Amino acid sequence: MTAVADAPQAELEGVSSPRAVVVGIMAGEGVQIGVLLDANAPVSVMTDPLLKVVNSRLRELGESTLEAAGRGRWALCLIDGSPLRATQSLTEQDVYDGDRLWIRFIPDTEHRSQVIEHISTAVASNLSKRFASIDPVVAVQVGAGMVGTGVILASGVLGWWRWHHNTWLTTIFASVIAVLVLMVAMMLLMRATTDADRRVADIMLVSGLAPLTVAAASAPPGSVGSPQAVLGFGVLSIAAALALRFTGRRLAIYTAIVTICGLTTLASLSRMVAATSAVTLFATMLLICVVMYHASPALSRRLSGIRLPVFPSATSRWVFEARPDLPTTVAVAAGGPPVLEGPASVRDVVLQAERARSFLSGLLVGLGVLMVVSLTSLCNPHTSERWLPLMLAGFTSGFLMLRGRSYVDRWQSITLAVTAVIVVAAVSVRYALVLSSPLSVSIVASLLVLLPAAGMTAAAVVPNTIYSPLFRKFVEWTEYLCLMPIFPLAFWLMNVYAAIRYR
């Protein structure tokens, strides 16, 4: 394809007019575009305008435009690919009417490195290669985290004021903050389209639970006590349960909050209604946590919706067939993932298993917090039978440490092991702070150093050692031996035996 060019005007006497040449530019897939170029101008002056003209003509023809690939430059080349000199004109390089040229992108073969003039520039240059820079998504998440931190700190300040002053300031101020933060969280959740947007909304939603709890707890008049605890923890547990139900995310966090606040609400209600003693409340909480440690796998399975298979009955029903509502046959669609024919699919089973893992992790974290608080509160150095809660704490820590080996997920095993270690550390620190004697401080300091050292030694030796079945059975019996005295010691601590004896 050629373009028709006007004939150059005849030169006037005494005046030299610039020459023009009509050349064919090869561009795209077999496309030739005729253009009129100045024969006396340097090639470098005409390259960029020529590229724009060629791309506009390619768009008119429906062809793909010329795009730069990486670092380099555009150049006019002869038909054999040799580039023309950029500083010379077409006439100087023997290019005349009717010649064909080729405009192409020549990659830059030179390696360029950043010039480092100061040590600070070198540090910044190396760090930019190893770490990602702040993008808008991360900036929004950091801002949401700062807002959430400020809301939680403001809730703490308002709660401190309510602890010392019986006024309505805390209730009104915390209610306004809670309404504003929760409204923003709901708007973000409704408009969220990506995981980053949902993460920001979840941060705002979790932080909004703090002022809501403070507002509810400070509403009852009078000094802070069990009525305020019942209302505050009750509202927090209900709000966390609703967030868990309607968002379907952050299952472990909301499950831990519901576990802690639900049991604390029941204990506060017992204290408010029946004036239950602190020892009875903490000992009962300890026993409930031990029972829930055994029931947590089954509870998490039920919460996730996983149904157990039906075992054959004595009448031989379902011996050679599965339950009617369970999938039995694997079907693979064209280009799709394998699914099970029936109401459940492979993806549903994987999703339910992940939900069960999140529920179980939240339960273990919540129960661990309650165990640490209960055992630390029971171990009072000034009681007459101080050895009794110490034995209870020791057996409970041993049970938790050995119980962690039965979990497949390593984070769940770590949660139980950390709970056992924190129980021992918290009880020891309380004894050192309350007794304030050189002997107690020396013993506690030695214990706080030797206990992690023993744990590190066990972590280095146990995974690399193969144990016999007899030794494994011995460890299992040791776990049962640590579990057996917990209930009798707790009943003894609550004076249940004395009440039965003198009844």
Swiss-Prot record:
Keywords noted in UniProt: Cell inner membrane, Cell membrane, Membrane, Transmembrane, Transmembrane helix, Transport
Pfam family, one: YukD
Topology term for the membrane: Multi-pass membrane protein
Gene3D superfamilies per record: Phosphatidylinositol 3-kinase Catalytic Subunit, Chain A, domain 1
Annotated transmembrane regions: 137-157, 169-189, 200-220, 224-244, 250-270, 272-292, 359-379, 414-434, 443-463, 480-500
Disulphide bridges: none
Location in or out of the cell: Cell inner membrane
Function comment: Part of the ESX-5 specialized secretion system, which is responsible for the secretion of EsxN and a number of PE_PGRS and PPE proteins. This component is essential for ESX-5 complex stability and secretion.
Family (UniProt): Belongs to the EccD/Snm4 family.
UniProt name for this protein: ESX-5 secretion system protein EccD5
Organism: Mycobacterium marinum (strain ATCC BAA-535 / M)
